[in-house]
Amino acid sequence: MNITNCTTDASMVVRPKTVTEKMLICMTLVIITTLTMLLNSAVIMAICTTKKLHQPANYLICSLAVTDLLVAVLVMPLSIMYIVMDSWRLGYFICEVWLSVDMTCCTCSILHLCVIALDRYWAITNAIEYARKRTAKRAGLMILTVWTISIFISMPPLFWRSHRQLSPPPSQCTIQHDHVIYTIYSTFGAFYIPLTLILILYYRIYHAAKSLYQKRGSSRHLSNRSTDSQNSFASCKLTQTFCVSDFSTSDPTTEFEKIHASIRIPPFDNDLDHPGERQQISSTRERKAARILGLILGAFILSWLPFFIKELIVGLSIYTVSSEVGDFLTWLGYVNSLINPLLYTSFNEDFKLAFKKLIRCREHT
C-alpha cells in the first residue's frame, strides 16, 4: 500500500543505492514475495482438497489467503522493480492500476482479519444459535462485504487524479493527494477502526475462553464429588476438552456447542480432584490462549501500525519521510501477508494434516 504524499524536500534527498545494496534488497524482497506466494497457495490448496476443512470459518481463511496471494502476485513484484530501479518505468496507466490494486488488496487483507475475529467472537459467545447461522452463504456475504468496503475505501482518488497521459512518462508512482478528509477517511477505514474492533473482539474472546475453562473445571470438580452423578452420566457421551488451538485458529464452534449444550459435564480424570491441579491446568490453557492471541494481534499491529502512523502524519502535512523509510514501512505491512497463513493455520491439527498430505503427494509425483 503505497500512499506516500508527494511532498519533496531537499533534506529528504538521499544518495543513490549501490549495486550491492540493490542486490541485497532485491534478494530479500524476492524471498519474502516467494514465501508469501507459496504459503498462501498451500493454504488455498489445503482447504480446496481437504473435505474436513470445508467449513464456513475456513472459507474466510481461504479468502484471506487468496487476498494475500494477490498482494504477492500483483503488488510485491512491481514494488521490487520500483525500489531497485529507483524510478517508475512502466508508464502512467500501469502506475494507476498498480496503486489501485495495492490499496484494495491490502485494505481487504486487513478487513479479513476483522471479519475472522468477528466470526470467532460470535462462534464462542453464542455458539448454539450461531452454529445454525454459520453457513457457506453467510461466509460468502461476509467476504463480499469486505471486498466492497475495500473498494469504497481505495477507489475515491481515481475520481480526482489527472487521467491525461503525461509527457514525459512519470518517474515516480505515488498517489498524490492533498485531500485531508480522504486521508482521515482512508486510514481510519482501512486500519484504525478495524484495529479497534479486532482488539475489542479478541479481548472478549479471551475472557470468554477464560470463563469457560473455569466453568468446566468447576463442573468436573462437582461431578467427581458425587458417585450418583457419575452413575447417572455413565451412558452419556463424553465431550472433548476444549482445545485452545481450535478456538484460536479455525473453527471453535463445535467444541463450544458441545460445552454449551451440556449443563452437566461427566467426570473426566479422577486425578484432578485437587483444586491446585485443576487451577494449574486452567492457568496453562489461559496462558496458551493469551500467547496465541498475542501473536495474532502483535503481528498485525507491528506490521501495519507504523505504516498508518506515517500515512496520517504525512497526509496531514505534519512531517515528511524519505522514500527509503516509506518503502520500509510499506514492506513491513506487506510482510503481514506472509505471516497470516502461518498464524491462522499453524495451531490447527486439521491444517497440519492437510499440509502433510500435500507434501506427501508432491513427493510421490
From Swiss-Prot:
Compartment(s) where it occurs, according to its Swiss-Prot or TrEMBL record: Cell membrane
InterPro entries for the chain: 5HT_rcpt, GPCR_Rhodpsn, GPCR_Rhodpsn_7TM
Keywords for the protein's UniProt record, in alphabetical order: Cell membrane, Disulfide bond, G-protein coupled receptor, Glycoprotein, Membrane, Receptor, Transducer, Transmembrane, Transmembrane helix
Database matches in Pfam families: 7tm_1
Residues reported to bind ergotamine: D102, T107, I175
Keyword Protease (UniProt): no
Tissue-wise expression: Detected in the brain with the greatest abundance in the hippocampus, followed by the olfactory bulb. Lower levels are detected in the cortex, thalamus, pons, hypothalamus, midbrain, striatum, and cerebellum.
Name of the protein in question: 5-hydroxytryptamine receptor 1E
Species assigned in the record: Cavia porcellus
Gene name in the database record: 5HT1E
